[in-house]
Curated annotation (Swiss-Prot):
It is a peripheral membrane protein. This is Elongation factor 4. Required for accurate and efficient protein synthesis under certain stress conditions. May act as a fidelity factor of the translation reaction, by catalyzing a one-codon backward translocation of tRNAs on improperly translocated ribosomes. Back-translocation proceeds from a post-translocation (POST) complex to a pre-translocation (PRE) complex, thus giving elongation factor G a second chance to translocate the tRNAs correctly. Binds to ribosomes in a GTP-dependent manner. Keywords: Cell membrane, GTP-binding, Hydrolase, Membrane, Nucleotide-binding, Protein biosynthesis. The gene is lepA. It is found in: Cell membrane.
Amino acid sequence: MAAKQKNYATETFTDPERIRNFCIIAHIDHGKSTLADRILQMSGVVEDRDMRDQYLDNMDIERERGITIKAQNVRLPWVPKTGAHAGEELVMHLIDTPGHVDFTYEVSRALEACEGCILLVDAAQGIEAQTLANLYLAMENDLEIIPVLNKIDLPAADPDKYALEIAHIIGCEPEDVLRVSGKTGEGVSELLDRVCELVPAPVGDADAPARAMIFDSVYDIYRGVVTYVRMMDGKLESRQKIQMMSTGATHETLEIGVVSPEPTKTKGLGVGEVGYIITGVKDVRQSKVGDTITWAVNGAETPLKGYQEPTPMVYSGLFPISADQYPDLREAIEKLQLNDASLTFEPETSVALGFGFRCGFLGLLHMEITRARLEREFDLDLISTAPSVVYRVVKEDGSEVMVRNPSDWPGGKMREIYEPIVKMTVIVPAEFLGATMELCQSKRGQMGGMDYLSEDRVELRYTMPLGEIIFDFFDQLKSRTKGYASLNYEEAGEQLADLVKVDILLQGDPVDAFSAIVHRENAHWYGNKMTVKLKELIPRQQFEVPVQAAIGSKIIARENIRALRKDVLSKCYGGDVSRKRKLLEKQKEGKKRMKAIGSVSVPQEAFVAALSTDAD
């Protein structure tokens, strides 16, 4: 490596003409973090000896699952060797975005902070549904789009075929699609030169009152909330009083700086720059993502175009396995919420599982990751109940109830029930088209249309109830398409539905943890599945236990757990049959009495196993 050059990017108040803000949009596993690693290395801000894979993914769980969850940002120096700006010292801000469907909200924030984006597509797989969704978001924001094929070093890569596919989608020429390899570094410097040439410089009024947009905030144990901002107008300096425009709260900036690639303190931030602000606030909800920061005195009048607050789509109960971990769970969720503004929670009690929390998530992956982080980072053992969505129930008297939890389902007659629906896009290889359409139909999907992206890849569009997707749709889709399908969905309002609440009764008593709201057609299937499952999982008692599934007072499925019997005749060697009968009658009476007063204890493992979704 050449002698280490001075990182001039750590100096702020750069002339906006020399700044380029861009992000990378890609599907999971298309090599975005690897490309970001190469960019960091080539610009010289990370020395080879400090390099580690997925440099920007700080959470263990991100590195382990190979996905990016939080948007990270880095400020880099770059001197292009080609193009109109060859030889100029430019400053680039790379904002790394997550690629998963649940985190579309995080992507939309990162896009607001950029003027251009690199559309990164795996040269062996082609464009995926979620990448398409994020690409349309970028187009809505009028970003300059630079199409790139990654992983051209792979033996299975077919860059010519996929260059045509991308050109067809975004309307460029196939030869405009750049070819790079994040792994070997081939083509990366040409890509950065192209970014400098095509991405427009940020525009803003340097003399106007400051307006900075928050696009992320993270919680640091030592310094409180670190807020990442993009300056639109004016400038911010340290030791300055600032105001959050949505809440009106005022703070003082204790430290202001840039990430290059470690946080570096600077004098302040000017137009078009991306950096961080620390105010010593301890609550992330004080610095809401999408909010505008301005000066507390003589500040801006109008805030920047904000975002929508993220709305939870999926709800699930989280309960500690041992009741004494409840305070720890509360503390842990509060700490996670500091970093994750889209997580909502409220206390909940369950007869079967004790005290816990009803949490709202953006989607299934968000739920899984939150649970994994709670268990790993805070050392908790948790049970999560089956996920559910929000239903709107209109009762007979016209009053409305929002049902987030099966136990809130109103009794009596109901006039109308509405369930949330989503518009879903699935991209599958043509050979799996039949199996995929069959699956979507079985989940009450209505087809909206289909397009062939190339001769062997099809895009399907469906409208489908969200409740059908959250359970095991994704797993089934992957297994029917050998893992080649990709899926994206966005909310699309609600529709009337014929839904019922199925209760699972043990010895005539409902167990709230197993209740579910399902479509009337699927009620028998769910009832049979749960009763059979519980029959296997609950240990046999001294008396017979009926396991029933019911809709209201109507029983729709039943299994019996046979009683354990002691052999009362073992001491009778021969003798009169009436003696044997007397002993058996006595045992029968005892069992009857036990059944009347006995209660069934359900072991923890049975809850965990019964609530875990499976493929059947």
